[in-house]
Amino acid sequence: MHNRHIPPKGWRTPNRFSRFVIASLIIALLTLPLACRPTPIPTTAPAPTTIPTPTPDYLSLFVLPEDGSDVILNAIDDADESITFVMYLITNRNFIDALKSAEARGIEVRGMMELNPYGGGSSNVDVFSELVEAGAEMKWDPRSIKYLHEKMILVDGELMFVMTCNMTSSAFTANREYGLIDTNPDHIAEVVRVFEADWNRQDPGLDNPLLVWSPINARAELLELIDSAQSTIDLEQSSMLDPEIEQHLIDAARRGVTVRYISSPNWPLEDDYDEPARERMRQAGVLVRYLDDPFVHAKTFLVDGVRGFVGSENISTNSLNNNRELGEIFEDDDSVERLAAQFEADWAVATEEAFPVSELTVPECGYIDHQDARKFFYREVTVELPVLYVYNSGRVAWLMPDEDSDSNFKVVIFPGDFGKWPEMPDVYYGGKIIHVTGLIKKYRGWPEIIVHNPEEIEIVGETGQEPGRMPAN
């Protein structure tokens, strides 16, 4: 249990520190007929095997999806007294179950969540209720802020995670994310102070914060970080929607700083809100590339190769001015080195074109397996899918291979087209093996084909199983 990022029990005593190994990313491949298996896409960068021995003021960077969820789940499992968390969006079942197990063994669990996450539906309400029923103390976001977008977990008041990621399956399997593990007592005291103030609906009253908080000091800290650059700025960002930050990056490029910017495009590109900023930055000399897989949900800066930033703050006016956000600027050598190495790996596979079409050949059988759909983004192909799980909320219907709706290929049908089928599509195709033909698009890092007509789906067999059904929210 203690061979990941987190120190083993007894870590509070300096002479008991020991090395531990980061979990390697494990990729499970479905065995397919050789004629229908395309050449696999290489991973961008392997996870390192070791990190430095921690100290009482320990700081370490972890990278997702390479390092997996054990770094967080093991910390929760090892809690002796308390778990405190703030999270914008929670859908990951392992995280939910770990919190419930901690509460069941007598650990005090307290958490704050966002009531209305953008595009999150009612999932947070369901998770909130489930945790309350398990005995956790829970509160919604303070109404004084726009969104509670912070991503923080604190274990036993002494081991803290500051992250770019929500607790979703996509965060650990499909997204480029980063997190810091921090044991600095002054940093933790500041986080506890803000948590308690938000919990009690009070002003935290931070005059000179050590960390990067929205809406308190995030804008000023990020501008100072950008303006301090002498030679290089490397950033991986999920959005670019703040004119002032954009202008300071442009100014840096114009004064001779090499600025490299990685983000993920949204389809279609003409509807991507970030594309106008990308183009303005490109015209000003910023080097812009797109990383399609993994999906960039990160919020990072690396300046002159010596100062890094990781946090929940998006480059958006709302994030910096109105949300509760948390980030950290750091100069720890090992953490900066890992951030730099991952950026270089991502830059090497990122492209100047937004949606490069893969050159992989569709097998001779004429279709691909659903597990290979991620290798054929933005191509019109035929996908074979055993419909073993279905969902219909009345607002959308999904056909899926299993119950993990966050991290698999799915067929999507909207209610305006339901009447084209003899019965509801989820009922009609449940338990069938289908060939669906269409453009493979990306949604939250995972592939889907949106279907409008029955002619786009061919039933080719039976699964022999009664399909499972996700409950409608």
Language model feature labels by segment:
Residues E359-N473:
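OB-fold single-stranded nucleic acid-binding module
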Residues L25, L29-T55, F355-P363, E466-N473:
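Ser/Thr-rich, Proline-interspersed low-complexity disordered segments
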Residues D334-F355:
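Amphipathic alpha-helical interface segments
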Residues V194, W199, E353-L360:
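Pro/Ala/Gly-rich low-complexity, hydrophilic intrinsically disordered segments
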Residues R4-I22:
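Bacterial N-terminal signal peptides that target proteins for export
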